[in-house]
């Protein structure tokens, strides 16, 4: 007898239309009260939070509502002498926040706000002999950081600054028997890591190394009866996996393998009709993180009210065309 799947029940009165105006209002007002508890407690990831907010506003055609000059000044203040960029002023630099900052500056076509050569040196300094990347000087190794490194350098037009061949070797060593990828060699396959690794391989033109059918099957197995997607077996669905899983499927040319309409219904059910924004699951609290990935997931599903999104960079396709960054995808 099979084990019941963990899932959620979508109520009959759950939202079923896209509340775009409410989402734009929610993001535009988020952080306007700097003494809010939620805002204060998210300081440790502020740079990524700004990236989530700006990207979703751009996808909705509402970027003009955000305070461009204040954001550019903030980013400049977060670059350290080593070249790396931190989540907030006074915090330590990290590859995650360095990528977020470069993505924001690319959105605004203002990359010269920071010292680009210093950023390149910082990324170079974090590559290890086996080709892997640490996230910061403290040394944690993770395929997320391999993606952050090549994505940052690709946006800067400096991908040749690192040992790309060794970086590819390391990421491929993290491939598992099920076609997926983990954070390090031998680690369990996880949708978030798969997104990072397929994105990495797209940027480095190595997608031919992936068994797209095997990986596509594993990713499609993430869809539950509710229509939502989870990140690994026996976990609840979460709107953020509408991005990690969908983007990976798009990269390997297998997006048509899932039930798109059921997923769309699940994503829409995670909206808050009163405040705007998306939650991880229907009825939970909304936040900018899930709002971006809900909207980005709907873009991949072909939602006409949202700009086309790059499945590799989670940025508007028009921005990547402007900077001439077009990673390969499996057709």
UniProtKB/Swiss-Prot annotation:
The enzymatic reaction requires the aid of a Rab escort protein (also called component A). Its EC number is 2.5.1.60. It comes from the Eukaryota. GO terms for biological process: endoplasmic reticulum to Golgi vesicle-mediated transport; protein geranylgeranylation. One of its GO terms (cellular component) is Rab-protein geranylgeranyltransferase complex. It holds the Pfam family Prenyltrans. The modification N-acetylglycine is found at residue 2. PFTB repeats lie at residues 20-61, 68-109, 116-157, 164-205, 212-253, 260-302. Its cofactor is Zn(2+). One of its GO terms (molecular function) is small GTPase binding. Zn(2+) binds at residues 238, 240, 290. Belongs to the protein prenyltransferase subunit beta family. Catalyzes the transfer of a geranylgeranyl moiety from geranylgeranyl diphosphate to both cysteines of Rab proteins with the C-terminal sequence -XXCC, -XCXC and -CCXX, such as RAB1A, RAB3A, RAB5A and RAB7A. This is Geranylgeranyl transferase type-2 subunit beta. It comes from Bos taurus. The lineage of its organism: Eukaryota, Metazoa, Chordata, Craniata, Vertebrata.
């Amino acid at each position: 007898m099979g084990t019941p799947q963990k899932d959620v029940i979508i109520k009959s009165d759950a939202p079923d239309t896209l509340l775009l105006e409410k989402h734009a209002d929610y993001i535009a007002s988020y952080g306007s009260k700097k003494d809010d508890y939620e805002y204060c407690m998210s300081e440790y990831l502020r740079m990524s939070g700004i990236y989530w907010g700006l990207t979703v506003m751009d996808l909705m055609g509402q970027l003009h509502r955000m305070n461009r000059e204040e954001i550019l000044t903030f980013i400049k203040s977060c670059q350290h002498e080593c070249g790396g960029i931190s989540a907030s002023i006074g915090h330590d630099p990290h590859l995650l926040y360095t990528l977020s900052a470069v993505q924001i500056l690319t959105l605004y076509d203002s990359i010269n706000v920071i010292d680009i050569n210093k950023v390149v040196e910082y990324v170079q300094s974090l590559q290890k002999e086996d080709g892997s990347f640490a996230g910061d000087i403290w040394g944690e190794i993770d395929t997320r950081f391999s993606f952050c490194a090549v994505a940052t350098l690709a946006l800067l037009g400096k991908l040749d600054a690192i040992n790309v061949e060794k970086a590819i070797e390391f990421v491929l060593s993290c491939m598992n028997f099920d076609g997926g990828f983990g954070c390090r060699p031998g680690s369990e396959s996880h949708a978030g890591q798969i997104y990072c690794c397929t994105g990495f391989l797209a940027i480095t033109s190595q997608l031919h190394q992936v068994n797209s059918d095997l990986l596509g099957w594993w990713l499609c197995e993430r869809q539950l009866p509710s229509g939502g997607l989870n990140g690994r077996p026996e976990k609840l669905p979460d709107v953020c996996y509408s991005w990690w899983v969908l983007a990976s499927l798009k990269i390997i040319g297998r997006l048509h393998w899932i039930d798109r309409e059921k997923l769309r219904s699940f994503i829409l059910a995670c909206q808050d009709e009163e405040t705007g924004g998306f939650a991880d699951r229907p009825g939970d609290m909304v936040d900018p993180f899930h709002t971006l990935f809900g909207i980005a997931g709907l873009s991949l599903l072909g939602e006409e009210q949202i700009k086309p999104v790059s499945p590799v960079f989670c940025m508007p396709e028009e921005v990547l065309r402007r900077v001439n960054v077009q990673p390969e995808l499996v057709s």
